[in-house]
Amino acid sequence: MCRGNLYIISAPSGAGKSSLISALLERDKNDSMTVSISHTTRSPRPGEIDGVHYHFVSHEKFEQLILENSFLEYAKVFGGNYYGTSLLNIEKNLAAGIDVFLDIDWQGARQIREKRPDVKSIFILPPSISALEKRLIGRGQDSQDIIAKRMEKAADEISHYDEYDYVIINADFDQALVDLEHILRAERLTVNYQKTQNAALIHQLLVK
């Protein structure tokens, strides 16, 4: 069985990352890809389901998992809550031939690259700063103060785009989705991937 690929997908809030990932999964008819479900110590928000949106655990449980080296990466964010990516769940999916997406920021991406040099990373950029702000306002979810803070954070996040393997500019959603699909397909056609996944065939072809 072919092994899945591990992908990091990062973007400033409002760039369309979550929508692109959701659309990609909807078009996946073979269950060949999934999003890693993070662990967190924060309380569930209305409509969130344990095991679907996050694995909700106590601080004590999370810190126990840290001691057990259960996370590929984790962070303690503003407000004191932990977020972490489970190593076991990722490995199970990759071994089953499933591509796994990590929806994380550039700081988490740095942690993972140090541990997993095989990871592929994609950064989603907005077509302009004004378009990003317009999308955040159009959501109708945040106050002007929160939007201002998100915009300030976005400038910092965007400055790290060149740490990634691929960049997609989400000016047109459908085209950005096609670009994302092409990246996934291309990664399964690299020489290194084919040498690993089709070693027996290549050996047979080279036998004189």
From Swiss-Prot:
Q: Could you tell me what reaction this enzyme catalyses? A: GMP + ATP = GDP + ADP
Which keywords annotate this record? Answer: ATP-binding, Cytoplasm, Kinase, Nucleotide-binding, Transferase
Positions that bind ATP: A11, P12, S13, G14, A15, G16, K17, S18
Enzyme Commission identifier(s): 2.7.4.8
- Location of this chain's protein in the cell: Cytoplasm
Domain of life, per lineage: Bacteria
Which residues are in the Guanylate kinase-like domain?
A: 4-185
Q: Would you identify the family this protein belongs to, as annotated?
A: Belongs to the guanylate kinase family.
As for what it does, the entry says:
Essential for recycling GMP and indirectly, cGMP.
Q: What is this protein called?
A: Guanylate kinase
Q: Which organism is it from?
A: Histophilus somni (strain 129Pt) (Haemophilus somnus)
Name of the coding gene: gmk
